């Protein structure tokens, strides 16, 4: 039987498909997504939930003239499929392959590069204003999930969107999930609206009945519609969106293409911003994903029949070590509380929330609030631990500096996914945190070399009287160097092996690489000292002074961009103390955005692997391997 999906090879091809075949096409799209993502990995549940919604948008819009902005963008697979990128799915999130997020350079049907949450509405308002200034006619639609709507930036955009005089359509994809289940007032508000279909039915029936009243029926309906105290305010508390100046349509079934098209066409005739509230099911069409949508949000290659990963990793990750250790510490200290921004699973805090439900706080996608909320807890005598991906902590820079560091409050920042993350690409690499944290006055920044040291550092963080950040990679916890268990002392590194000539000074995850580098150098007849820096801020200047006495080459290693990183700080130290006889190799990430690909492969491409580092050292020493 010929596949309908085979007929869609270019943008707008879906408009050639008969409406009678929409259901079959939706089923084919789901099978295609499951088959391909099971091989490459990627975001599955969110994309399965927006199949019909995306089809309706593509039937309504003309690409690339019209502009469709996806919030976060991980749910844009169906959009990519319908815009001629079907054959690229075999390279999804692979090195030099198709991105898992919208990319303007990938297709002119992608209106904006996204990756972080709650940005779409601001982008759409900008596109609408640009359309107005350019006197163009294109449609502008933003798709945002109910989870992303909990972000403060989304509210800032809504505040401005309500003042628009020209048409802009916001599609609220309400599946009651971000990655994990949503929390907070907005989630509760949408829950009430979601279950209030009776209001829509009652309103429609009442309107019909009133219009049948001779002579005055139409006038009564008009008066009710114009009144701010009309029936909608009795049945839907607040009508938040309309009170902000927008027209609200919904809630409607996001899996019903005809309903979606009717709503979109109606919305396009309104001057100003219109919000279409759609209700969808995350993971729809694949039973394991429907039952456990958070588990299938982001997946590694898996067996379709069982839903289980193809590769079972028995090794423990840093995230797992963190979650287990924090529970242990919280059992000893009643002042320890944990905070996450909609990532309890990803940051390893789900079990903590089960054990200590009253001391666990999921604030939704609101990193700025999470940090200042933690500051408030710290000011009142608690020990808050903010667990967050490195890339997302960027969003709370001012709160860290102004609300935590100025007051020297004892907040712990646990930075997961620090360094090269891999397949999610440039918007998710955690390669900037050392640069934007290490210059903050009073903020201590540390990184562990292995699992044992990670646990000791977490203990140190809980006891530390001041703001402190600990960074660790998306990786299995390193178990090497298990005999090196020197006590953690403020501002002091750890000397692992002492020789002469070359000093290998590594931070966190790069200590494991430095061990391999040293082994290679020995085979080449080169001596090398190995230092586990431990502290990025403050710098262990005493150890650096000592190393200058017997070494002619410093090799610093870090998973962070060169500018503002650990290596640059060491360079400044050497310059300020006029150590002209010391050469310095700064092994770090170039000042560039690193795209998607396997973590190990990306490290090789960036010259962060042991072999590449040895090559650089040999060239610096004027010798060949």
Curated annotation (Swiss-Prot):
Superkingdom field: Bacteria
UniProt-annotated binding residues for Mg(2+): 146, 175
Role, per record: Catalyzes the acyloin condensation reaction between C atoms 2 and 3 of pyruvate and glyceraldehyde 3-phosphate to yield 1-deoxy-D-xylulose-5-phosphate (DXP).
Pathway: Metabolic intermediate biosynthesis; 1-deoxy-D-xylulose 5-phosphate biosynthesis; 1-deoxy-D-xylulose 5-phosphate from D-glyceraldehyde 3-phosphate and pyruvate: step 1/1
Transmembrane segment boundaries: none
Family indicated by similarity: Belongs to the transketolase family. DXPS subfamily.
Essential cofactor(s): Mg(2+); thiamine diphosphate
Subunit annotation: Homodimer.
Gene Ontology MF, one: thiamine pyrophosphate binding
Keywords: Isoprene biosynthesis, Magnesium, Metal-binding, Thiamine biosynthesis, Thiamine pyrophosphate, Transferase
Protein name: 1-deoxy-D-xylulose-5-phosphate synthase
Matching InterPro entries: Dxylulose-5-P_synthase, THDP-binding, Transketo_C/PFOR_II, Transketolase-like_Pyr-bd, Transketolase_BS, Transketolase_C
GO cellular component: cytosol
One of the GO BP terms on file: 1-deoxy-D-xylulose 5-phosphate biosynthetic process
E.C. code: 2.2.1.7
Record text on cofactor binding: Binds 1 Mg(2+) ion per subunit. Binds 1 thiamine pyrophosphate per subunit.
Protein residues bound to thiamine diphosphate: 74, 115-117, 147-148, 175, 286, 367
Catalytic activity field: D-glyceraldehyde 3-phosphate + pyruvate + H(+) = 1-deoxy-D-xylulose 5-phosphate + CO2
């Amino acid at each position: 039987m010929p596949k309908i999906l085979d007929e869609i090879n270019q943008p707008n091809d879906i408009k050639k498909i008969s409406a009678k075949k929409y259901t079959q096409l939706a089923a084919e799209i789901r099978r295609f997504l499951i088959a391909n993502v099971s091989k490459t990995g990627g975001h599955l549940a969110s994309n399965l939930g927006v199949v019909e919604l995306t089809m309706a948008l593509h039937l309504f819009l003309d690409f690339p003239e019209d502009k469709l902005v996806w919030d976060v963008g991980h749910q844009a697979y169906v959009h990519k499929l319908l815009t001629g990128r079907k054959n690229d799915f075999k390279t999804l999130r692979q090195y030099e392959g198709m991105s898992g997020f919208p990319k303007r350079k990938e297709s002119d049907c992608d209106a904006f590069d996204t990756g972080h949450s709650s940005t779409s509405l601001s982008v759409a308002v900008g596109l609408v204003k640009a359309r107005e200034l350019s006197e163009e006619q294109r449609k502008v639609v933003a798709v945002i999930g109910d989870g992303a709507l909990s972000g403060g930036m989304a509210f800032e955009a809504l505040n401005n969107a309500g003042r628009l005089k020209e048409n802009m359509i916001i599609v609220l994809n309400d599946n009651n999930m971000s990655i994990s289940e949503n929390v907070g007032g907005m989630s509760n508000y949408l829950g009430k609206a979601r279950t209030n279909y009776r209001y829509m039915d009652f309103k429609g029936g009442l309107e019909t009945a009133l219009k049948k009243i001779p002579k005055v029926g139409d006038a009564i309906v008009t008066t009710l519609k114009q009144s701010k105290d009309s029936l909608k305010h009795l049945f839907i508390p607040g009508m938040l969106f309309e009170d902000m100046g927008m027209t609200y349509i919904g809630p409607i079934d996001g899996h019903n293409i005809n309903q979606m098209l009717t709503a979109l066409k109606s919305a396009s005739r309104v001057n100003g911003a219109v919000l279409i509230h759609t209700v969808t099911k995350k993971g729809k069409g694949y039973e394991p994903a429907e039952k456990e949508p958070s588990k299938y949000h982001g997946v590694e290659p898996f067996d379709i029949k069982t839903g289980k990963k193809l590769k079972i990793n028995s090794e423990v990750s840093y995230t797992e070590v963190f979650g287990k250790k924090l529970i242990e510490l919280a059992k000893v200290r009643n002042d320890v509380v944990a905070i996450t921004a909609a990532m309890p699973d990803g940051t390893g805090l789900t079990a903590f929330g089960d054990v200590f439900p009253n001391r666990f706080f999921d604030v939704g996608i609101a990193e700025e609030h999470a940090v200042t909320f933690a500051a408030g807890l710290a000011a009142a005598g608690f020990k808050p631990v903010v667990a967050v991906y490195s890339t997302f902590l960027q969003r709370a820079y001012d709160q860290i500096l102004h609300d935590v560091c100025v007051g020297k409050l004892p907040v712990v920042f646990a930075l997961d996914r620090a360094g090269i993350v891999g397949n999610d690409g440039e918007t998710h690499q955690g390669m900037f945190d050392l640069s934007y944290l290490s210059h903050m006055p009073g903020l201590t920044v540390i990184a562990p070399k292995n699992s044992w040291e990670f646990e000791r550092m977490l203990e140190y963080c809980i006891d530390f009287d001041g703001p402190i950040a600990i960074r660790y990679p998306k990786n299995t916890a390193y178990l090497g160097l298990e005999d090196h268990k020197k006590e953690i002392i403020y501002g002091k590194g750890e000397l692992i092996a002492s020789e002469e000539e070359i000093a290998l000074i590594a931070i966190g995850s790069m200590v494991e690489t430095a061990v391999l580098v040293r082994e290679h150098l020995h085979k080449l007849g080169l001596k090398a000292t190995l230092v586990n820096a431990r502290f990025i801020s403050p710098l262990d200047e005493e150890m650096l002074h000592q190393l200058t006495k017997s070494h002619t080459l410093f090799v610093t290693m870090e998973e962070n961009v060169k500018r503002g990183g650990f290596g640059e700080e060491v360079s400044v130290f050497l310059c300020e103390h006029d150590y002209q006889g010391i050469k310095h190799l700064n092994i770090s990430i170039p000042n560039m955005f690193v795209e998607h690909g396997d973590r190990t492969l990306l490290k090789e491409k960036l010259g962060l692997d042991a072999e590449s580092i040895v090559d650089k050292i040999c060239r610096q020493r004027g010798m060949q391997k």
